[in-house]
């Protein structure tokens, strides 16, 4: 049985008020929670125990999720902000010898079975990567000929360091983290502390997947995640009333909403239980009205 630790403590601050007080992983895409999409994707390929590293301020929401939606997850709560790697480093002695770790608020469109197979063949920790056209917008993994990560370069000026960036999915060996642990202080980040130290010690390899990932933490990406090719909008099938005179373009309408006469909605998200009054014009906004 594989162990996977999903980092689900973050909130989508740029999606407020839709996301106010809610971890990003519990937001829905086309009616399905992001965390459920991730769990389903991994469960299709292998046997996993799902361990969710949560913020204590979301304790009530996560207990409700486990009780009413998915009893087959283990909830692990951070009592304070530990950054992306802090909980794992702090509790390293109780971790298995090898385990997967992933940012629990990403949508992956990748050859996941190949990554899992590559991780089983790799003798040290492995970070998933994918290629982008413009690496100057990202933190780049400079990779050697042996697929070892040489260094992390933040927003390089050109492609001289390559064009591979982190997928947010890792297979970690406890022995590798133990080698660098004395140099780590908690809170600590995988991206800023753990992985750069591991790469200097030649303890980190990469596997480049086919495909990409989507972080749905912005207005544009949240809308994009909902609308598939051939569609103009995504409108929830759950108790939504829209006037025939309303105009809606490239937008998302969530559950239990009413859109009245002569409303125009463009490039926007209408949160659940909202009422949009007649003659309202909405553009590039996230709305929660009643």
What are these regions (language model features)?
Residues 28, 49, 129, 142, ...:
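Short, well-ordered beta-strand micro-motif
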Residues 20-25:
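Short alpha-helical oligomerization interface
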Residues 26, 141-143, 195, 206:
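A structural signal for short hydrophobic beta-strand segments in well-ordered beta-sheet cores
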Residues 51-55, 129, 269:
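Short internal beta-strands
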Residues 100, 107, 113-120, 133-135, ...:
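Catalytic-core segments of class I nucleotidyltransferases/pyrophosphorylases
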Residues 126-143:
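Short beta-strand-to-loop element that shapes/binds the nucleotide-sugar donor at the catalytic cleft/hinge
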Residues 234-290:
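Structural signal for interior beta-strand "rungs" in well-ordered beta-sheet cores
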